[in-house]
């Protein structure tokens, strides 16, 4: 039991109840006069409710509406509930992609700014893009475009933002855009000429099919700077397969721990196999009562 919240009029309070086993999560309202309880929202799953990573609760006004995060349709999305009638008003976001994080709620304008992953079908589904949508689910606008993962810095009046995006094989690009995502100009593009002169090489991105022969599995390869295509190298896979997140780097860096080991004469590979987080619910559920799997069938495939 946590997140206890009193209504402004003190006529009721709400709390979250995470049932033992993590298959039921409820928000329950309690009448402060007579102690009667009613469920406001209920999440159930035959496997698990990912309450520790995919949780967002935002009360609108005096609590008459609730913005709630859920995987109930198989993907992590936002929903708007009528808390007085104790029912869903409408999905705020929907589609075969996930909401990663809510960044800002404009209560008067009834809009939400949030981070999305997988919203561009032809890009790596782990890349973060930034979006805006109305609370009634209309007007979805993707504010970022570049084929990479994005970070935003807003102007104080939120009329403009600087979009910094990169990939492991693409040095950072900084763009100036307006609040609706319209491109204004490129501010700066990182110059790595001096870095390349040291012999440093970009990692290589790759995609392979998973154990089912259908699901795309995304990974990165690091080779020694003196790599010789004629030679044969031992391959080491860098593995941390905890189901609470994903681990393959997505943004550009000039230093990777994997590269340090590659310099000893190895090829390093890292993937995020089935059972890791931030894809579909089905993808994540592979870990259910199956932690020992650790994505190994997908690793064997590549």
Feature map (PLM): residue ranges:
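A short loop-to-beta-strand structural motif that recurs across blades of beta-propeller domains
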Residues: 26-28, 77-79, 129-131, 173-175
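Serine-hydrolase catalytic core recognition
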Residues: 10, 16, 144, 149-302
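Glycine/Thr-rich phosphate-binding loops of Rossmann-like dinucleotide-binding domains
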Residues: 23, 76, 122, 171-172, ...
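Short, small/polar residue-rich loop motifs at catalytic or cofactor-binding pockets
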Residues: 23-24, 52-53, 74-75, 98, ...
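Generic, well-ordered alpha-helical scaffold segments in large soluble proteins
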Residues: 7, 16-17, 30-33, 43, ...
């Amino acid at each position: 039991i946590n997140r206890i919240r009193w209504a402004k009029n003190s006529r009721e309070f709400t709390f979250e109840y995470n049932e033992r086993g993590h298959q039921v999560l409820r928000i329950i309202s309690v009448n402060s006069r007579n102690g009667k309880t009613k469920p406001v929202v209920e999440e159930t799953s035959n496997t698990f409710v990912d309450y520790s990573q995919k949780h967002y609760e935002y009360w609108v006004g005096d609590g008459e509406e609730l913005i709630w995060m859920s995987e109930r349709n198989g993907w992590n999305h936002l929903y708007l509930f009528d808390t007085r009638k104790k029912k869903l008003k409408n999905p705020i976001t929907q589609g075969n992609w996930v909401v990663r994080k809510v960044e800002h709620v404009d209560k008067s304008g009834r809009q939400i700014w949030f981070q999305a992953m997988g919203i561009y079908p032809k890009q790596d589904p782990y890349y973060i893009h930034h979006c805006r949508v109305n609370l009634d689910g209309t007007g979805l606008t993707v504010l970022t475009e570049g084929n990479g993962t994005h970070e935003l810095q807003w102007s104080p009046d939120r009329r403009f933002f600087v979009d910094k995006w990169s990939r492991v094989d693409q040095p950072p690009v900084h763009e100036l855009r307006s609040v609706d995502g319209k491109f204004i100009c490129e501010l700066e593009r990182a110059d790595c000429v001096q870095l390349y002169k040291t012999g440093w090489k970009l990692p290589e991105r790759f995609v392979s099919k998973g154990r089912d022969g259908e699901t795309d599995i995304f990974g990165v390869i690091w080779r020694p700077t003196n790599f010789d295509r004629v030679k044969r190298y031992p391959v080491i896979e860098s593995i941390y397969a905890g189901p609470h997140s994903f681990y393959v780097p997505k943004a550009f860096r000039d230093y990777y721990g994997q590269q340090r080991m590659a310099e000893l004469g190895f090829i390093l590979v890292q993937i995020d196999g089935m059972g890791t987080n931030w894809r579909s619910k089905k993808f994540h559920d592979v870990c259910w009562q199956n932690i020992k799997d650790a994505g190994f069938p997908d690793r064997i495939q590549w």
